[in-house]
Design a protein with these regions (language model features):
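Transmembrane-helix motifs of polytopic, lipid-linked glycan transferases
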Residues: 97-118, 149, 153
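Transmembrane-helix signature of polytopic, membrane-embedded enzymes
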Residues: 110-133, 161-168
Length: 559
């Protein structure tokens, strides 16, 4: 079965596929453009990205997710960063290499898939540039790379779905699951849809057999992870706090109602353009399904591998939109760009190839949606400012200066100036230097609230197996006792309490708070702009080897 459309009534021009060489060349070019864009527009990793770097740092200290520290479901996120740091060191450029490479993979596969579906290099170029320009947040790289590869697998494999390919779909679903569990759910939904729809015309026996292969392969491939989790905390003990954490995180960002266009401000202002993109992203997969059904009903199309692939990507898109499209939309929309780009390319290809009485209408509608979406992306993603940052629209010589500045910054392990991830880190810079001088590399820190950047920039592991001590994050009596057991077995000279969140910490984790009160003394108060500051504590009874000359604080290593 060939991956092509069947035509009727003379409404479309004959299909001409771009050559494989042209697709490969353009896909490689897209990946290089992506790397250049991500590097030139780099403005530091935000605080959320440091969650995964803190986990990676823990792994380099010999700890493993679940066994030694709590993990809500991101083991491969830590592992990829840990592997890169183990091979190439702690420089910021190492993590940027990981991120840029993943986004480059996403762009290349998006281009390859879009060119296959649209039969047009021009359309594939447009949607891929849209994806690049949206500049998803750095820690969201799996949302681009994984879904682009999945879409490509659906489209290319649909016409010949062998047992080996079904097993590979299951394996890829497991990989996605281990990056973040919901990725496995969304990609798994699309994969199962592909298996069903690509086997639909091969008879019930073949259909049931292929579903069995997919589900069986999933079970077998997930078994080692499931046994590992069951051995250390139990599957119920693993999923229950993880789901509570995810539910609490989603509670503050879930869309309570469909976003509305506002007419009290600029009609084409950012708020309205965010709403426009939201409805474009939500509408595209349903538009694809309706278009497929209508073409089948009109006899313009028969069920083919392309039908199965487009439907599978649509199922994946609908599922991921439910999970990804939350508030704030400006930050969340880029996460869902891949299926929108791929499916949008298919719709554009149909419109641009159309001939006959309704061709002008199809062209006009597609041109309007394309132009409106392009402008929305420019505004929502602040593309003009990003171009200035990169030195592309700046004064002559700005790009050269930008490259020279990045070369210095990215060679260091510590971010500087405007690349610092948080006010806490900026305030704690002298403390980081003190920790480096006066504690051992194997010592740990406790930090209340969620400030994973503190552990990475201090180059010290988090204590108690928790990078955050905050409400809804592993706060049950069992979780607190497990954290205390780990704390007692570790060397933890310092505790940092974020006073702005102190009341929440005391209420949510009384056992941990009591332990800190019993075993630690106040050391210093670090002022943080617009907050109550950070209270530093030092372990009571720990014998110093001397006094730090710069701070007057106890030093616990001989110098």
């Amino acid at each position: 079965m060939s991956l092509s459309l069947e035509h009727g009534h003379g409404v479309e021009t004959p299909e001409v596929y771009p050559s494989p060489a042209a697709i490969l060349t353009a896909a490689l070019a897209a990946s290089l453009i992506t790397v250049a864009w991500r590097v030139l527009t780099f403005s530091g990793f935000n605080n959320d990205h440091y969650i995964y770097l803190a986990g990676a740092q823990a792994m380099l200290l010999g700890e493993w997710p679940v066994r030694d520290f709590v993990d809500p479901g991101w083991p491969l996120m830590y592992t990829v960063s840990a592997a890169a740091r183990a091979m190439f060191g702690r420089a910021l450029g190492v993590e940027l290499m990981v991120v840029s490479s993943a986004f480059a993979i996403g762009a290349a596969f998006t281009f390859a898939t879009a060119s296959r579906l649209s039969k047009s290099l021009v359309i594939a170029t447009i949607v891929t540039l849209f994806e690049i320009a949206m500049s998803p947040r750095s820690f969201g790289y799996p949302k681009i790379a994984l879904y682009a590869v999945a879409a490509w697998m659906f489209v290319v494999w649909a016409d010949h779905l062998t047992t080996r390919r079904i097993v590979m779909l299951a394996a890829f679903t497991v990989v996605a699951f281990l990056f973040r569990h919901d990725h496995g759910l969304y990609i798994g939904a699309g994969s199962l849809a592909l298996v069903v729809l690509a086997s639909w015309q091969d008879g019930l026996k073949v259909l049931v057999l292929r579903i069995g292969v997919f589900v069986g392969a999933l079970a077998v491939l997930l078994m080692p992870w499931a046994l590992y989790v069951q051995h250390y905390v139990g599957l119920v003990g693993y999923f229950q706090p993880g789901l509570e954490f995810s539910r609490a995180e989603a509670e503050g960002t879930v869309l309570r109602a469909l976003p509305r266009f506002g007419f009290g401000g600029p009609l084409f202002g950012q708020a309205n353009l965010e709403v426009w993109l939201f409805y474009v992203f939500e509408t595209i997969p349903f538009a694809c399904l309706v278009t497929l059904w209508f073409r089948l009903w009109r006899g313009q199309h028969r069920w083919s591998a392309e039908s199965a692939a487009v439907t599978a990507v649509s199922v994946m898109a609908i599922a991921m939109n439910l999970g990804f499209l939350r508030t704030p939309l400006a930050a969340r929309l880029p996460d869902a760009v891949v299926p929108a780009a791929v499916l949008g390319s298919w719709l554009l290809g149909l419109a641009w190839r159309r001939r006959g009485s309704r061709a002008r209408l199809a062209w006009a509608v597609s041109a309007f949606v394309l132009a409106s979406s392009a402008w929305a992306i420019v505004v929502v993603a602040d593309v003009r400012n990003e171009l200035n940052t990169a030195g592309i629209l700046n004064r002559p010589g700005a790009m050269k200066e930008r490259i020279a500045d990045l070369r210095v910054r990215l060679s260091k392990p510590m971010p500087e100036r405007d690349h610092l991830p948080s006010r806490n880190s900026q305030a704690l810079m002298p403390f980081y230097a003190y920790v480096d001088r006066c504690s051992a590399p194997t010592d740990r820190l406790v930090m209340t609230g969620l400030s994973p950047d503190v552990f990475v920039l201090a180059n010290r592991g988090f204590a108690g197996g928790q990078m955050a001590f905050r409400p809804s994050f592993y706060t049950s009596p069992t979780d607190q006792q497990r954290a205390l057991t780990r704390l007692r077995a570790q060397s933890v000279p310092f505790v940092i309490v974020a006073l702005e969140e102190e009341a929440d910490f005391l209420r949510a984790m009384p056992a941990i708070a009591s332990y800190v009160d019993t075993h630690y003394d106040k050391l210093a108060l670090v002022p943080v702009p617009d907050t109550r500051g950070l209270q530093l504590y030092v372990e009571r009874g720990r014998h110093p080897a001397g006094v730090d000359g710069a701070t007057g604080w106890p030093c616990f290593v001989a110098r």
